[in-house]
Amino acid sequence: EGSAADAVEHLLERDRPAMSWLNLGEVHYVLARRHGDAEATEAVRDLEAVLDVRLPEADVVLAAARIKARLPMAYADAFTAATALDRDAELWTGDPELLVPGAAWRWRDLRPSG
């Protein structure tokens, strides 16, 4: 099996994965803290070109709130799950908070095995 980066690269070659602007904002602030605003802005621009990024609608916001109320996870993670449900998409992640057995959303574990 290849790395998570390889799996995501192959996904991007054949599809346009979904992401919420809320989560893309999270990507920006993490990168800005590590590498500065200019690099973070460039990375977001690059991701916007290959992802289907949308602002969350009210029903997705409320779905995220319901997920957060039921499960011990960050609100941004709840948005990730709600976006996957809204788009009927498999959530690709290595975040243990989102790898919930029996969750309403489908997920693929990108953590290295072993």
How would you name each of these model-derived features?
Residues 1-19, 32-45:
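Short, well-structured N-terminal submotif of metal-dependent ribonuclease cores
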Residues 18, 54, 108:
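General small-molecule cofactor/ligand-binding pocket signal
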Residues 52-94:
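Active-site neighborhoods of divalent-metal-dependent phosphate/nucleic-acid chemistry enzymes
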Residues 81-114:
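Acidic, PIN/NYN-like endoribonuclease modules and their adjacent C-terminal/linker elements
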